[in-house]
Amino acid sequence: MKGLIQRVRHARVEVAGEIVGAIDQGLLVLVGVEREDDQARADKLLHKLLNYRVFGDEQGKMNRSLKDIGGGLLLVSQFTLAADTRSGLRPSFSSAAPPAHGEALYDYLLARARDQHPEVACGRFGAEMQVHLVNDGPVTFLLES
C-alpha cells in the first residue's frame, strides 16, 4: 500500500463541482492499493500517516507529526500509484488491486483513520475528482507499507 503525502496549508476534493472533502493545515494523502495489500498493511500505513514527523517544531525542524499538531487528514484514492513505469512508454497497472479489493481496503483505512484521528476527510473512490491544494514547503514523501 502506498501513500503519497503532501504537507498542505489547506486542500479540498471536488466531484462534479461539489466539495466532498476538505481540510485546513495537515496532510493530503493519495492512496494506492496493490494486489497483495491487506488490512495489516493498511494499519501500518495509517500509523505512519499519523506519526510521521513532517511538521516543523519551534526551530523549524521536522519533529512534529499530524497527531502532534492536530491537523487534518485528507485521504484520496489513486490507483495510478500502483503503476509499473519501469519499461515502455505506457504505465502498466497489473500490480494495482482489483477495484472491489481496492475499495474495501480504502474504506477500511478510512474507517480506522476516523477511529484514531479527530479530523479526517476523503475523496470518493473511483470518481473523477479535482484536487485543490496549497502545498506547504513543498513537503512530499512516498510512504509504503
From Swiss-Prot:
Keyword tags: Cytoplasm, Hydrolase, RNA-binding, tRNA-binding
Renumbered ranges of motif Gly-cisPro motif, important for rejection of L-amino acids: 137-138
Annotated EC: 3.1.1.96
Gene3D superfamilies reported in the protein's UniProt record: D-tyrosyl-tRNA(Tyr) deacylase (3.50.80.10)
GO MF: D-tyrosyl-tRNA(Tyr) deacylase activity; Gly-tRNA(Ala) deacylase activity; Ser(Gly)-tRNA(Ala) hydrolase activity; tRNA binding
Catalytic activity: glycyl-tRNA(Ala) + H2O = tRNA(Ala) + glycine + H(+); a D-aminoacyl-tRNA + H2O = a tRNA + a D-alpha-amino acid + H(+)
Major location category of this protein: cytoplasm
GO cellular component terms attached to this protein's record: cytoplasm
Disulfide pairings: none
SUPFAM superfamilies: DTD-like
Subcellular location: Cytoplasm
Source species, domain of life: Bacteria
InterPro entries per the UniProt record, alphabetical: Daa-tRNA_deacyls_DTD, DTD-like_sf
Domain commentary: A Gly-cisPro motif from one monomer fits into the active site of the other monomer to allow specific chiral rejection of L-amino acids.
Similarity field: Belongs to the DTD family.
Role summary: An aminoacyl-tRNA editing enzyme that deacylates mischarged D-aminoacyl-tRNAs. Also deacylates mischarged glycyl-tRNA(Ala), protecting cells against glycine mischarging by AlaRS. Acts via tRNA-based rather than protein-based catalysis; rejects L-amino acids rather than detecting D-amino acids in the active site. By recycling D-aminoacyl-tRNA to D-amino acids and free tRNA molecules, this enzyme counteracts the toxicity associated with the formation of D-aminoacyl-tRNA entities in vivo and helps enforce protein L-homochirality.
Classification via HAMAP family: Deacylase_Dtd
Name the UniProt record assigns to this protein: D-aminoacyl-tRNA deacylase
Species in which this protein is naturally found: Stutzerimonas stutzeri (strain A1501) (Pseudomonas stutzeri)
This protein's encoding gene: dtd
